[in-house]
Amino acid sequence: MNDFMYYNPVRVHFGADAMSHLPEELGKFGANVLLTYGGGSIKRTGLYDRVLDALRAAGKSVYELSGIMPNPRTEKVYEGIELCRKHKIDLILAVGGGSTIDCSKAIAVGAPAEGDFWEKFYVNWESAETGIPLGVILTIPATGSELDKSAVITNFATGEKNCYDSEYEFPRFAILDPTLTYSLPKNQMVNGIVDTMSHLMELYISPPDDDFLTDNLAEAAMRTEIAAARRSIVEPTDYEARANLMWTSSFALCGMLNNGKKTDWESHCIEHPLSALFDVAHGAGLAVVHPAYLEYICESAAPRLARFARNVWGIDPAGKSESEQAKEGIAALKKFFHEELGAPATLRALGVPESCFARVAELTDLSCYSYQRLTADDVIEILRRCY
């Protein structure tokens, strides 16, 4: 187990009654609030009106930034920064999933900073000195952004999708009501399940192998996600299933499962250029890339993948080598993603052309910790295998 420092200051209100705590949280901040959200779904479900009523009852002046898309763009961040500076925003309230939250985080650290937020934080990785307070009302369990200090932003002009970490990007509070997920389309739920599983696997399938508590927690989280996903797909309003999906996605990135691990984010690093270049849904891209990546490193990571097969998928090890167990575990993962959930299985199905592979490899961060350090040629081969 490696040395670590653990810190997570997010106050979480979880449950069917979680929204009742919004007024008390709003009372802790100043009068000017920037409300951020995506498309029209929160208006169709009535959530927008509930939030607006709470803001008005709290005496807040509300300014809005709507239309935040999946793979949130730099353009929306710039727009939000301008609104924050113009109206002297005291609190950003993000209502939605990871895209809305990440865009809001980038705005939170970008608005008080001098210079261009992209160059300052996402290219030069300068440390943020302060940030506008952020609150979250989660509607899509997927990214875990409601409990972490990271924000992923896409620059379509350069074809880059980069991540920035800062303690000023931790939300001050997060409201997690599983009933808010009942109306999600199946494809959004599936993408969220895949993203959560990918986070858990990247934390777990990484050295060292002697971090027993963290690894056991990760295995339990993966088994929970799989079981809850199967129930939720059959019955979208199964509260216990939705509650477990929501809490597992948050738990995956709250920092607990990083403790003592080096972590291997290579699948995310390969997928990010696909989203940046072709606007691929993040979870859909991971459903294709992550199993192919595990197949590629299977021999190097055989002991860990064999444990993954036994303890997560229930593979019987009798008479099988670690390599054979590992392959059966990956096969079980692919069946879950592609057959049970119906997630895409190939890059071709996502509309990604084979001609882009060299460019994707060029944009892929190869600095991740792994059982097998990749080169650009390795990335190209992985992409070919899942085409």
Q: How would you name each of these model-derived features?
A:
Residues 89-105, 139-145, 277-280:
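Glycine/serine-rich anion-binding loops at beta->alpha junctions
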Residues 203, 207-332:
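Active-site segments that bind and position negatively charged phosphate/pyrophosphate groups
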Residues 312-387:
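C-terminal charged capping/lid subdomain of soluble metabolic enzymes
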